[in-house]
A protein has these predicted regions:
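Active-site-adjacent helix-turn-beta-strand microarchitecture at beta-sheet edges
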Residues: 62, 129-210
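Short beta-strand segments
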Residues: 85-87, 124-126, 160, 220, ...
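Conserved, well-ordered active-site substructure
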Residues: 133-151, 204-257, 262, 267-299
Length: 299
């Protein structure tokens, strides 16, 4: 066999192997379910209607003895922004839901489907934990993942059993230490937007795409049991989108003392009483992305 012929054969074989390996990596990242864990029985929903008898419901509000939700829409920076003001009688009504009621990579469903599964009243997409194999994950008191993130700053949102919020840095505390303090939820997307009533990001904050205008999603606390859910549209002719600094300002203007950035872009979705409130997009077209998890309000 001549050297030239050998080189051609080797090139073909190498190309086939490289293509197969690339396909496997993409499938492992986006398609193949991995490390699947069923949600603990105590965290599963009952499958009954979450709305209380006698609840007063409109297109933009819900009120019963335990939950009060009011949704408003405003224009900010040439963008439609949807703001849900939530007041609860108990922190247990603020919950997290997993797609298909399972934890694992590539276990996905739309925010709408997971909200229906959980019998939610109000829901937004979560931190899309399944897109990464690192970052602390706790849902409804169950600690699923304890692997620290790789970045210098990995800010998590911790929600405690009394309804208080805290921004925690994974480099400074373990997931087990957070759990021991009474945490019930840990989200690991970030960054934090507001802490102690002070905006913690600005236009120069170095986060991938942070200074670009995108659809956004955030959750904040005014005080324990009083929360704000925010989703903005973006990437359309009608709505430009927000940068992180813009999003932080929206949360401050809503009265938040603590606020945290959740997964945005095509994931950004707000759902209320069976309907998507905002305009989620992919490639400029209406499309509700399938994601790993949601944050929601429910009985």
């Amino acid at each position: 066999m001549t050297g030239r012929k050998f080189c051609r054969i080797w090139t073909i074989v190498y190309s086939i192997v490289l293509t197969a390996f690339t396909a496997w990596i993409l499938s492992d990242t986006f398609i193949i379910p991995d490390d699947v864990v069923e949600m603990p029985e105590q965290a599963e929903e009952t499958g009954v209607d979450n709305t209380q008898a006698g609840a007063v419901v409109t297109d933009t509000s819900y009120k019963d003895d335990n939950i009060s939700i009011t949704i408003t829409t405003k224009r900010y920076k040439d963008t439609n922004v949807y703001i849900a003001d939530v007041v609860l009688s108990d922190a247990s009504y603020l919950k997290a839901g997993l797609a298909q009621n399972k934890f694992g990579r590539n276990i996905k469903a739309t925010t709408s489907d997971t909200a229906e599964q959980c019998n939610a009243i109000l829901a937004v997409n979560g931190d899309y934990y399944g897109y990464r194999d690192y970052g602390y994950v706790m849902r409804n008191g169950y600690l699923y993942r304890t692997v620290r993130g790789y970045e210098k700053i990995n800010e998590d949102l911790v929600i405690y059993d009394d309804g208080d919020f805290e921004i925690a840095n994974e480099s400074a505390v373990t997931a087990e230490e957070i759990e021991a303090k009474g945490a019930v939820q840990i989200f690991s997307f970030g960054p934090g937007l507001v802490n102690n009533g002070v905006k913690t990001v600005d236009e120069d904050y170095e986060v991938t795409q942070s200074m670009l205008s995108n659809p956004r999603c955030a959750i904040g606390m005014i005080e324990p049991l009083h929360y704000v859910f925010v989703v903005s549209d973006g990437r359309t002719d009608e709505s430009k989108g927000l940068g992180l600094s813009d999003l932080a300002q929206v949360m401050l203007d809503a009265g938040c003392t603590v606020a945290y950035n959740l997964d945005g872009g095509g994931s950004a979705t707000m759902w209320f009483m069976g309907k998507v409130i905002n305009y989620p997009t992919t490639g400029g077209e209406y499309h509700e992305r399938r994601v790993s998890d949601i944050v929601y309000i429910g009985e």
